[in-house]
């Protein structure tokens, strides 16, 4: 059984990819991986896991503002993840969470950001569904 209705998946996947990319692009001197870990373990992301329409329908900029206010979040100094990788990681995590119906806080522990950074070269050209299945339920 999937985490929520299939009708939501493409929007959630796209918005999370855009969110991760937005953070990496606008803050090249901040730690994108630390943001991703915080976001995936947040109440904001839990609301998306639970298909709460208010959060599920937000755009990436709206989601960023909501997350920062709700979680009292500030970015940490560090290095941004570059290129298309943040977008892909966001999409991968959103689809993985939906596909295996796991809490996002568990997904980021089972499939760490560092693993996805290393596996990016071999996975990012695959269809997202196939990439998620290749990684498998850890």
Regions found by a protein language model. Name each.
Residues 1-101, 110, 114, 119-138:
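C-terminal alpha-helical interaction appendages
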